[in-house]
Design a protein with these regions (language model features):
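Cytoplasmic (intracellular) domains, linkers, and terminal tails of multi-pass ion channels
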Residues: 1-9, 18, 26, 116
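Short, structured motif recognition centered on aromatic/hydrophobic residues
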Residues: 6, 15, 52, 106-107
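Regulatory nucleotide-sensing modules
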Residues: 11-63
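Non-catalytic, surface-exposed connector residues within folded enzymatic/regulatory domains
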Residues: 18-21, 71, 108
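Short solvent-exposed loop/turn micro-motifs enriched in small/polar/acidic residues
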Residues: 26-27, 45-47, 67, 80, ...
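Short, acidic, Ser/Thr-enriched surface-loop or helix-capping motifs
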Residues: 37, 55, 66, 77-78, ...
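A short beta-strand-loop-beta hairpin characteristic of the jelly-roll/cupin
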Residues: 60-72
């Protein structure tokens, strides 16, 4: 996947509309494309938050354990959906587990870049 495709995809997402083109290009240069196989965990409930994720392709299931440790399905994320920002903003642990429901590619933005380019904007 080349930078132009990634830039075009990210530019279409509403929460990146606040960024100038140069800021968006710099943010993308700091982002990582990560591949996950079906069934693979992206992060677990209780993990420390270190990245914000955007679904580029595939499906990601969001799960939470109840008080009896049974998994509750909270939903499915698809292309263009994002997740993981709550733990970055609140500086708390992840409140859910995310697992690839099928082979998926995610764009991962680390905490430092997230705070600089997204969270600090009005």
């Amino acid at each position: 996947m080349d930078i132009k495709d990634t830039l075009r995809f990210i530019r279409e997402l509403w929460f990146f509309s606040i960024l100038r083109d140069d800021e968006l290009a710099e943010l993308i240069s700091k982002a990582e494309m990560r591949s996950y196989k079906a069934g693979e965990i992206i992060f677990n409930q209780g993990d420390k938050g270190d990245s914000f994720y955007i679904v580029y392709s595939g499906k990601i299931r969001v799960l939470r354990k109840d008080k009896n440790q049974a998994e509750i399905n909270l939903g499915v994320m698809t292309r263009g959906d994002h997740f993981g920002e709550t733990a970055l903003i609140s500086d708390k642990v992840r409140n859910a587990t995310t697992r690839a429901a099928e082979d998926s590619i995610l764009i991962a933005i680390g905490k430092e870049a997230f705070n600089k380019y997204i969270f600090s904007k009005p």
